[in-house]
């Protein structure tokens, strides 16, 4: 029975990782005037139906990580209650929040990230990348606590073909991106409030400088010799904003939409605003599967 279950899990892992090119994750964070902090995201899965479920983890639950050779990784007991949405397995929380307000989500990060090589001798401190959200939300109240603890672990992938990176936020609005490159863990303050997929966060931020000409609103009329040119419609000062579904283009589009959006009065109104903004990142299935 254990052999059958492990084979089934390996097949599910293969489905997740093989579909990486068809996954488009776009995350934004928003602040309301009443102090509420909202994290919102999409998971555009254009390959096949994605098994997912609502997960509740109470305090005091004993948990164990998977490794590439089975469920024999690090063991831990939840210190905080957690709610979240999982993919494939209930332990693989894609987005969640704990009882003290720390929130986290994973975003696929193919080709650019790389973990430490898996070594079965270190199973006692080995944590699967797809269980990092489960681990950190059940263990920590702050980002600083996470930073102090994560260096003692070996985070590995259950399949070598893809990796993920993570967005972590506190109720105050302090938000970081965590990436692992060459086995080294990097944290970046996320002041822009956006995350997509590859390339890495530093590259995405540098790429934003290609769009310093963009503005909210309409462009001013231009006198060209004896001809006066007028904008053809509203939001013409955003002409040049990328509209495709690649991660760099979604990052730029989300950054401008998020940072030009008016601040709403309440958290509830900001949740509605987040849905409206993220509608701009729906990926039609036929785009990936013609």
Model-derived segments and spans:
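Bacterial N-terminal signal peptides that target proteins for export
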Residues: 1-8
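C-terminus-biased signal that marks the final domain/tail of proteins
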Residues: 23-38, 46, 51-52, 158-162, ...
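Catalytic cofactor-binding cores of redox enzymes
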Residues: 152-185
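Short helix/loop capping segments that flank catalytic or ligand/cofactor-binding pockets
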Residues: 48-49, 113-115, 176-179, 186-190, ...
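Bacterial N-terminal signal peptides
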Residues: 8-18
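A contiguous strand-loop segment
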Residues: 24-121, 160-162
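Short acidic-glycine loop/turn motifs at beta-strand connectors
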Residues: 31-34, 98-100, 170-173, 179-184, ...
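Proteins synthesized as precursors that undergo proteolytic processing into mature forms
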Residues: 122-156, 160, 267-276
């Amino acid at each position: 029975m254990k052999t059958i279950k492990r084979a089934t899990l390996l097949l599910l892992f293969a489905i997740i990782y093989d579909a990486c090119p068809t996954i488009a994750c776009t995350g934004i964070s928003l602040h309301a005037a009443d102090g509420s902090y909202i994290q919102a995201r999409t998971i555009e899965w254009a390959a096949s139906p994605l098994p997912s479920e609502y997960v509740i983890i109470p305090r005091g639950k004993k948990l164990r990580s998977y490794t590439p050779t089975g469920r024999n990784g690090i063991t831990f007991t939840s210190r905080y209650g957690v709610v979240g949405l999982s993919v494939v397995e209930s332990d693989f929380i894609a987005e969640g929040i704990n009882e003290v307000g720390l929130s986290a989500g994973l975003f696929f990060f193919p080709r650019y990230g790389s973990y430490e090589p898996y070594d079965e001798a270190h199973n006692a401190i080995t944590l699967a990348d797809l269980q990092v959200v489960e681990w950190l939300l059940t263990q920590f109240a702050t980002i600083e606590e996470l930073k102090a603890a994560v260096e003692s672990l070996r985070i590995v992938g259950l399949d070598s073909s893809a990796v993920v990176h993570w967005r972590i936020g506190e109720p105050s609005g302090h938000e970081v991106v965590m990436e692992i490159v060459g086995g080294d863990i990097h944290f970046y303050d996320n002041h822009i409030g956006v995350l997509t997929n590859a390339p890495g966060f530093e590259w995405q931020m540098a790429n934003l400088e290609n769009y310093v000409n963009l503005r909210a609103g309409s462009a001013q009329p231009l006198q060209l010799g004896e001809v006066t040119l007028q904008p053809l419609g509203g939001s013409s000062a955003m002409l040049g904003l990328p509209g495709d579904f690649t991660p760099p283009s979604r990052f730029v589009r989300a950054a401008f939409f998020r940072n030009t959006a008016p601040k709403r009065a309440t958290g509830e109104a900001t949740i509605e605003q987040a849905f409206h903004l993220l509608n701009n990142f729906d990926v039609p299935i036929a785009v990936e599967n013609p």
